C-alpha cells in the first residue's frame, strides 16, 4: 500500500470525496469543470486523495462513471491520489473494471485507488437495467476476488480465466518484455459489518461511509481490525472514514448549504427524485413532523459550521475510532462553499500550500 502520513497537525490523513452534485440551475458540464477545479484545489492544499462516486439516474449526481472523470483528472493533476469511492461492482463485469483501472494506472502511475462497493448507487429499476437479472449482490466477495486476480494476473492453474488477461497490466508487460507496472490500490467500501469483515479477511484497506449512517461504525471498524489477515499489499489494518461536511466563515451559511443536502436525502427517502434544491427553495419547504425528524437526522449527520467547529468534530471522530484517514464528502448546492470548506479545514490543520 502507498505510504500515508498525517496531514499537517492532524493525527490523520485528510482527503476529499466528490459526488458530482449538480443542483437546480446547474448543468453537468458546469459540474465537471468545477470538479476539475476542486481536485486541483485539493492538490494545492495538501489533501492526500480525491475520489469520485458512482451514481445512476439521479438529477443531483453527474458521475455515472467515475473512471471517465478520473481519466480527465489524471491530466489535470500531478501529485494527489485519484480514485473511485467507489465502483459499485455488482453493476459491472470485473474484467472491464480491471481493464479500465489498468488504463488509469498507466495514465497516473502510483496514484490510482479503486474503491469497491456493493450498493446499487441508484433505484431498483435502474439497478435492474444495469444488471439484467444478475444477482450480483449475492456474489460480491467472489466478484472482488475475480477483479483482484485480473489486476494482479494471478488466477491459479486450472481456473477458467487463467488465460484471460486485463490489458494494460502485468501480462502485457511480461509479453512485451518490459518492467511490470504497478496496480491500483484496491479498497473495500461499506457501512456495515459485512464489508468490514470482508476487507479484513482479504487484507485490504477499509473505508466506512459515515455519511450513510453511524450506528455501527465502532463495531464495524473493530470487526475489520479483528478479522484482518496480512496480505502482500497490506501488513496491518488501515481505515478511512468518509463524512459529509460543510464549513464556512458564517456558520449560518454552512447550515443553509447542509440543509440542501438533507432535503435531497429526504426527497429520495420519500420516493421523489434526488434533486438538489437551491438553499432558498430548500429553506422555504414546509415539512411534516415526520419529514422534519428526517431532516434533523441528516443535519446532525452532515457536519456543518465554521472551520473550527467542523475540525473539532473531526478530532472527536478520530478520538472515538482511531481511524487512519478522514475523507471530507463535499456537500451543498454551492461549489464556492465546497471550495471554502476545503480551504478552512486545510488552514485549521496547517496543511501545506503546494
Question: Model-derived features: where do they sit?
Answer:
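An alpha-helical appendage that flanks or caps ligand/catalytic pockets
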Residues: 2-8, 134-175, 216-322, 353-354
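Flexible, glycine-rich active-site loops centered on histidine and acidic residues
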Residues: 9-28, 91-156, 206
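Conserved, mostly hydrophobic/aromatic
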Residues: 14, 42, 46, 54, ...
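Hydrophobic faces of well-ordered beta-strands that scaffold small-molecule active sites
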Residues: 14-18, 50-52, 82-84, 112-116, ...
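Active-site mouth loops of central-metabolism enzymes
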Residues: 18-33, 87-95, 180-190, 248, ...
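Short, acidic/polar
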Residues: 29-41, 191-197, 309-316
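A conserved active-site cap/scaffold subdomain adjacent to cofactor or substrate pockets
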Residues: 191-212, 220-221
Amino acid at each position: 500500500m502507498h505510504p500515508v502520513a498525517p496531514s499537517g497537525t492532524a493525527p490523520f490523513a485528510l482527503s476529499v470525496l466528490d459526488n458530482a452534485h449538480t443542483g437546480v440551475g446547474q448543468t453537468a458540464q458546469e459540474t465537471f469543470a468545477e470538479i476539475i477545479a476542486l481536485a486541483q484545489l485539493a492538490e494545492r492544499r495538501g489533501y492526500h486523495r480525491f475520489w469520485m462516486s458512482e451514481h445512476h439516474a439521479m438529477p443531483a449526481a453527474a458521475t455515472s462513471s467515475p473512471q471517465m472523470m478520473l481519466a480527465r483528472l489524471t491530466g489535470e493533476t500531478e501529485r494527489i491520489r485519484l480514485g473511485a469511492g467507489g465502483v459499485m461492482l455488482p453493476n459491472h463485469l470485473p474484467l472491464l473494471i480491471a481493464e479500465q483501472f489498468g488504463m488509469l494506472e498507466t495514465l497516473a502511475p502510483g496514484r490510482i485507488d479503486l474503491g469497491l462497493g456493493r450498493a446499487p448507487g441508484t433505484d431498483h429499476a435502474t439497478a435492474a437495467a444495469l444488471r439484467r437479472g444478475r444477482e450480483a449482490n449475492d456474489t460480491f466477495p467472489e466478484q472482488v476476488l475475480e477483479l483482484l486476480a485480473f489486476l494482479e494476473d494471478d488466477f491459479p492453474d486450472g481456473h477458467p480465466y487463467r488465460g484471460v488477461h486485463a490489458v494494460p497490466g502485468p501480462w502485457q508487460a511480461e509479453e512485451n518484455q518490459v518492467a511490470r507496472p504497478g496496480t491500483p490500490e484496491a479498497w473495500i467500501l461499506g457501512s456495515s459489518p459485512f464489508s468490514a469483515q470482508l476487507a479484513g479477511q482479504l487484507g485490504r484497506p477499509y473505508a466506512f461511509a459515515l455519511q450513510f449512517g453511524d450506528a455501527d461504525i465502532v463495531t464495524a471498524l473493530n470487526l475489520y481490525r479483528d478479522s484482518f489477515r496480512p496480505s502482500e499489499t497490506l501488513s496491518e489494518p488501515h481505515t478511512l472514514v468518509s463524512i459529509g461536511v460543510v464549513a464556512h466563515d458564517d456558520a449560518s451559511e454552512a447550515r443553509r448549504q447542509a440543509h440542501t443536502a438533507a432535503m435531497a436525502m429526504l426527497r429520495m427517502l420519500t420516493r421523489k427524485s434526488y434533486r438538489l434544491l437551491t438553499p432558498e427553495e430548500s429553506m422555504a419547504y414546509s415539512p411534516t413532523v415526520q419529514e422534519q425528524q428526517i431532516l434533523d437526522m441528516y443535519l446532525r449527520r452532515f457536519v456543518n459550521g465554521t472551520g473550527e467547529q467542523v475540525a473539532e468534530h473531526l478530532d472527536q471522530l478520530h478520538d472515538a475510532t482511531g481511524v487512519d484517514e478522514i475523507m471530507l464528502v463535499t456537500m451543498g448546492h454551492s461549489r464556492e462553499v465546497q471550495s471554502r470548506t476545503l480551504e478552512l479545514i486545510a488552514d485549521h490543520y496547517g496543511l501545506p500550500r503546494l
